[in-house]
Amino acid sequence: MRAMMIVNPHATATTERRRDLLAHALAAEVRLIVAQTTARGHAAELAVKAVVGGAELIVVHGGDGTVNEVVNGIMSADAGKDAPMLAVLPGGSTNVFARAMGMAADPVLATEQILEALVVRQPPRTISLGRVDDRYFTFNAGLGIDAEVVKAVEDRRATGKPISNLLHARKAFTQYFRTDHHPRLTISVDDGPPRPGVHLVFVSNVDPWTYFQSRPIRTNPGTTADAGLGLFALTSLRLPGVLRVAGQLLRRHATPSSRGLLRSDNVNSVAVTCRDPVGLQVDGDYLGVRDGARFDSVPDALRVLTGVPAALRSE
């Protein structure tokens, strides 16, 4: 099997020594080419090169942003059923998609999962993706406060300062008090009637929405990568209601509910129009401001190599 390993050497948890260790292990089972990214957007270019070159597997070692670039590269190559499988070795600070796919947080253990899947010839999992305008996403996208938090964190990262889950929480708290508490968004679900009076929109392709350290934050517990998108939208930013919903998101088995919350776990599309330009983030990357966006579920879009189920392991 021909494979390319795409590595972001600047991701939070990647090192040269670890890259070489993981590549050596993978090379025992596949014909491996290792390529490192050098700039933003390079991972997508490398993914296109891998598809055109006939790779059957692309292994990504990096954070969520690198994974997103690779997925968009695969999709832009328009290879259809001949597109390579994707496997993810966590290398970032949060690694939402990798964890949602059942991969170990430790990249060495995740490599063992991939090798085991290759040895037993485990079929890949075919999953849906989300798409906003012309950009695909693997785990979430959003308009509003979460996008502004992402921008603030990216600005800090650009200065060379460290980032953390606690930093995200502080920025979210700050952004809440800075934001205009007048609703700016109108949404339409599955091309239905418009619903005005919305402050923010989170759209998920998997559960959980993200993680706070080891704890999953679950906006849409019923959303899976095998079905449609999860919608989470707030029609009120009053502090008591926001705190109540925030507490629900941190509970492992809670289903968020509130008078000011619009939520659905399986929708085909969400169209959003904005009274004023609003920030957009996709898989943790800030894409600038938009005066509207359309989120669509793209079924059966990507084949992902995941850990071996117990039933296969025992055969």
Where are these regions (language model features)?
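Short acidic/glycine-rich loop or secondary-structure boundary segments that cap or lie
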Residues: D146-V149, R195-G197, P208-Q213, L239-L243
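Catalytic core of DAGKc-family lipid kinases
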Residues: I6, E16, T37, M75-L200
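ATP/nucleoside-binding phosphotransfer catalytic cores, i.e., glycine-rich phosphate-binding loops
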Residues: V189-D190, R218-D226, A233-E315
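Structural motif
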Residues: R2, R135-Y136, R184, L200, ...
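ATP/NTP phosphate-donor binding region
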Residues: M1-H61, N68, A310-E315
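Glycine-rich phosphate/pyrophosphate-binding beta-alpha loops
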Residues: G142, D146, F202-N220, Y286
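Gly/Ser/Thr-rich active-site loops/lids in small-molecule metabolic enzymes
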Residues: D155-L167, P208-R238
